[in-house]
């Protein structure tokens, strides 16, 4: 049997080199094809992804405009306050950093402490530690000189007169948004326009650049309120509530010629600087949200309807004898004095607040005309856009007015 021919090592080498060359060419071709695909078809997506990974944008709240009284005195303003932020990617030991931060802040709860450990342990470029802190807290935290911890100047709402005009002014949340009162009604005007802070990081998420576009200040709003009159109204209302052991009360001072509100006070009240500590009932603006019967003040509406419709004049005599008036066979109306007032002039009916006289005037005016004047005076309607929560009141439809209802409306 013949021996096998010897294998030429040169042929084997050439075959192996050819295999390696083909494999390498195919591998390089795949890489090039992938690169072409990424550059031609995925370029925009990759650029956007890289930008998202390297750049973080944080909103910087604007400074709200001031709220002034009619003489330019400040009722609400904004002051600078430090907010602590962290760059978690620059913090090697989150638990240790939180321990030092809470020691400096002095009032961390167990829940806040745990929440901070979790947030500072995440691989993020930005996280708030605490916002709008007190100056002494800011000094203590700054003295720690911790890596990855910095400060942002934010705007904090401040009410220098504390409880004064609290229900009118309302209050502002942590994000600089008006939550109640005029702060909420005129929020878009007072708030201003937010700025931005751009943070750039490298591949290891280390911050190498920060850029801030400053916010735009909000507009100043001037009210018809007079700070001095507001103070007097609140003081006297408070004393009246104490003396009468009342649950609450309202006092309003108006300019009768223009309808301007010069003061609006409510009891109980609250401090808008610390509104979270106040009960909801104390934050309610009773002057515009609660319902009240107008009482004898409504007699002027009845009287003005009679004069305008020329039903009576100020010299018309009205007989209130015998000191009682029966309506619908069962309802008896008397004057509050409990005595027979006799014959009164139209003017004296109003001066003495005679119930019987007012009812007789109302019956002369009639349901249709009196109901029209009730509407003309704005009863049952919201009278000001300044108070979105205003309760317009309850006014019966004239079709439902009985004689007893007409009597009730006439005397208030």
Where are these regions (language model features)?
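N-terminal Lys/Arg-rich, disordered targeting/topogenic segments
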Residues: 1-13
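Beta-lactam-recognizing serine transpeptidase/beta-lactamase-like catalytic domain environment
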Residues: 4, 76, 201-212, 225, ...
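Hydrophobic alpha-helical transmembrane signal-anchor segments
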Residues: 11-45
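Small/polar-residue-rich segments within soluble enzyme cores
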Residues: 15, 41, 90, 96-106, ...
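Short, small/polar residue-rich loop motifs at catalytic or cofactor-binding pockets
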Residues: 54, 59-63, 194, 245-248
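Short beta->alpha transition motifs characteristic of CBS
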Residues: 62, 78-83, 88, 98, ...
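Conserved, well-ordered alpha-helix/loop/beta-strand core segments that scaffold catalytic motifs
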Residues: 126, 148, 204-249
């Amino acid at each position: 049997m013949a021996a096998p021919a010897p294998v030429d090592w040169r042929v084997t080498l050439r075959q192996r080199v050819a295999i390696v060359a083909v494999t390498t060419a195919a591998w390089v071709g795949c890489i090039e094809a992938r690169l072409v695909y990424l550059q031609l078809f995925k370029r925009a997506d990759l650029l956007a992804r890289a930008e998202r990974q390297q750049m973080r944008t944080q909103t910087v709240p604007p400074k709200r405009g001031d709220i002034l009284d009619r003489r330019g005195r400040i009722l609400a303003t904004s002051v600078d306050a430090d907010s602590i932020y962290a760059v978690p990617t620059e913090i090697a030991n989150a638990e240790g950093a939180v321990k030092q931060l809470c020691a400096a802040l002095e009032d961390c709860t167990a829940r806040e402490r745990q929440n901070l450990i979790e947030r500072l342990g995440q691989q993020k470029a930005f996280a708030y530690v605490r916002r709008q802190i007190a100056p002494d807290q800011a000094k203590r935290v700054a003295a720690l000189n911790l890596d990855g911890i910095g400060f942002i100047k934010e705007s904090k709402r401040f009410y220098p007169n504390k409880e004064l005009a609290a229900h009118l002014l309302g209050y502002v949340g942590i994000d600089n948004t008006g939550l109640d009162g005029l702060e909420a009604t005129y929020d878009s005007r007072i708030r201003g326009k937010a700025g931005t802070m751009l943070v750039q990081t490298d591949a290891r998420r280390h911050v190498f650049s920060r850029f801030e576009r400053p916010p735009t200040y909000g507009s100043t709003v001037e009210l018809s309120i007079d700070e001095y009159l507001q103070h007097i109204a609140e003081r006297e209302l408070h004393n009246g509530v104490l003396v009468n052991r009342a649950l609450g009360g309202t006092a309003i001072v108006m300019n009768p010629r223009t309808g301007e509100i010069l003061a609006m006070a409510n009891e109980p009240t609250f401090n808008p600087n610390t509104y979270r500590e106040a009960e909801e009932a104390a934050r309610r603006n009773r002057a515009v949200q609660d319902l009240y019967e107008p009482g004898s003040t409504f007699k002027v509406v009845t009287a003005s309807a009679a004069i305008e419709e020329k039903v009576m004049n100020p010299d018309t005599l009205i007989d209130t004898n015998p000191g009682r008036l029966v309506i619908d066979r069962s309802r008896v109306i008397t004057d509050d004095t409990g005595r027979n007032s006799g014959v009164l002039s139209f003017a004296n009916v109003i001066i003495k607040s005679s119930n019987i006289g007012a009812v007789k005037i109302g019956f002369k005016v009639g349901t249709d005309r009196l109901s029209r004047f009730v509407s003309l005076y704005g009863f049952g309607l919201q009278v000001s856009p300044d108070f979105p929560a205003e309760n317009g009141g309850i006014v019966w439809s004239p079709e439902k007015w009985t004689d007893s209802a007409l009597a009730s409306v006439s005397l208030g």
